[in-house]
Amino acid sequence: MKKLLSMLLAAAMLVSAGAMAFAEGTSEKGTIVYGSSTEIGGDFAPSSWWTNNATDKMIRDLTNDYGVTVTNQGGEFVVNPTIANNIESVVNPDGSKTFTVTINEGLTYNNGEEIKAADFLWAEVFSCSKVAMDTGAKLTGHLTYVGGKDYYEGTATAVSGLRLIDDYTFSVTILAEKIPYYYDLNYIGLKPFSLKYWLGDGVELKDDGEGCYIAGDFTKEGVEKQLEYARFNAGEDRVSAGPYNLVAFDKGSLQATLTINPNYAGNFEGQKPSIEKIVVTKTEDATWADALKTGAFNFYDTVTDGNQINTALDIIAEGGFDYVQFDRAGYGMLNFQCDFGPTQFEAVRHAVALLL
């Protein structure tokens, strides 16, 4: 599907024009109240394991930012030198492609626990498993990694295309049908997650020479309770690796609070956050302009409606506010999960299509 490039009027209605979440230099005290037109859903699981609310995603990105590869300011996939010490790739005789990654030593989660290679791999093994599907997660890693389908179907005990080489080195092998791919660096945009936090003490990642697998009580019953807690937890015990820690979420007011993670090593440019606290709150279409002018919040994001853009420009003309305009490459799509759930049935998909 063709990507549409649209111009969006944005996010930067700041009372102080210099207040940027990723400014260089010494941390400056202060709080930004971020007004979001999309309410927080409260599902803070990695990526879109279950849901993918836009504001939830923004919070996830602020709390999990240690991707091996990331997109730069121009939208190009680049290697993240904060995380990756070395990356090598080779196209195999069967057409598959193997990426071998060595991460930097000394990286830690917000709780001080050291990040190692296994932290990047277990979630990929999880994405290849029937256990993920049993918990309702919408993950399809078995369609990307060599050996993933065999692991998913139970004909193999490990994912052969995911290898734990040593404490700081791992490799992933991508199926030949997925190669070549212009954006293949995205295949190694893996982020570290604490296995203990997400799946509990009863499991561990292992590689006995044939590929990675999750050992222990790796069943729906064995991990579901901890997964549920980890998804929705917002507190001091939440383990993450990003510029901010999610320390509170009020379901009644739909307000989340994030504070600086002092253990954060920096983004791909080495930048660290300068705003001490970010409060994310729900705004209303009918009242956002007045709320902004009276100081209820001081940052309003992603203004795309023509009338709202004109209102925003009027506020800026009055003084005390500024804006940032940015490009967005994106498209809208409605797709069906066809291998399980109600939409596995053709009649259901046809019925939904007839409603459009």
Regions found by a protein language model. Give the residues of each.
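Sec-dependent signal peptide cleavage junction
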Residues: 17-28
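N-terminal lobe/hinge region of extracytoplasmic solute-binding protein
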Residues: 35-92
